[in-house]
Amino acid sequence: MPGAGGPTVALDGFGAERGFEALAEGARAAAAEGIAVRVFGPPEELGLDRAEGVKVVPAFESIGNEDDAVPAVRARRDASVVLAARDVAEGNADALVSHGSTGATMAAATFGLRRMRGVQRPALAVRLPVPGKPVLFLDVGANVDVRAQHLVQFAFLGAAFSEAVLGVAAPRVGLLSVGEEAGKGRQEVVDANAILAAASGIDFVGNVEGRDLPGGAADVVVTDGFTGNVALKLMEGTASAVTGAIRGAARSNPLAALGGLLMRPALGGLRRELDPDATGGAILLGLRGIAVVGHGGAGAEGIANAVRLAAHSVDVDAVGRTAALLREGDAGRGALSSAVSDPADA
């Protein structure tokens, strides 16, 4: 492990919508907990120094959301996210974190860290901002178009990660669809349902509907990247609207204000659980290294939590344990290996 006292995280210094100040504050907060942070960005704008437990690696070029991610990653060898991914690949850091372009982060991580054996497409997985037992949701943006076999792979990847990192024993896995019946949904969902229902080594509970996402009907919920991204942002927006409405109602009259005052501790805890910053970000599953895609609008606490998520994933050997769990059982091996020869993803 690169860091003598704990994990080392390579943090992309560009891309945070709240600017260099929030990124620097988040890096300092994570470093104060013993996480070594290497920030790739412009030293003067970041205003960080080695004494704070953070090392700044000069980088002055970035890849934005307006850029075509894959060509940009290949062409801009000195872009911050490319340098950070290379830092992990070369063994100087244990994990990559970026709050910049999702596409660029995925491309840089995939090129630099490489996919696990048998994995066709890495998937972005996020712990949903819901109270109670953790619910892992994937894919939330890496793969807009998928086939049944990809959904099956995502199911095994998500189940392995949920058990290894989130500590959920024998996680229940569901497919997001428009109805609970096995025949409901697009053809790839119907086909994936049939494959998973017949597979061993996974606790498949069938289809789940959108209303079931926050209710714990499954510990791992699988869908394509387009649907997942829309659903995740809808949940984030709804949570923000609900907490805002509660605050507004509590100020509507003196009696409501008194009730709001009495409820403040409980509502504060609920708000923290629903806050997207609390999850840290989405982790790219299926790679031979750790890569976390943080929310672009994250504040300092969200940035620190993304670094913490990456460091925790290193501490518990998420990659090794996920790979080991995937190797257990013929169903898991078959689900991953049967798609390797698919020329469409070569």
Show where each model-derived region lies.
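N-terminal phosphate-binding or glycine-rich loops at protein starts, especially the Walker A/P-loop
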Residues: 1-46
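Short, glycine-rich nucleotide/cofactor-binding loops
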Residues: 9-21, 73, 142-152, 293-300
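Short beta-strand segments
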Residues: 12, 40-41, 57, 98-100, ...
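Short glycine-rich anion-binding loops that position phosphate/pyrophosphate groups of nucleotides
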Residues: 14-15, 61-62, 101-104, 111, ...
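Short glycine/serine/threonine-rich phosphate/pyrophosphate-binding segments
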Residues: 17-23, 77-91, 95-109, 120-125, ...
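Glycine-rich phosphate/diphosphate-binding loop of Rossmann-like nucleotide-binding domains
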Residues: 21, 38-44, 144-210, 219, ...
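Phosphate/nucleotide-donor binding subsite
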Residues: 50-93
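Glycine-rich phosphate/nucleotide-binding loop
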Residues: 110-137, 217-221, 225-336, 342-346
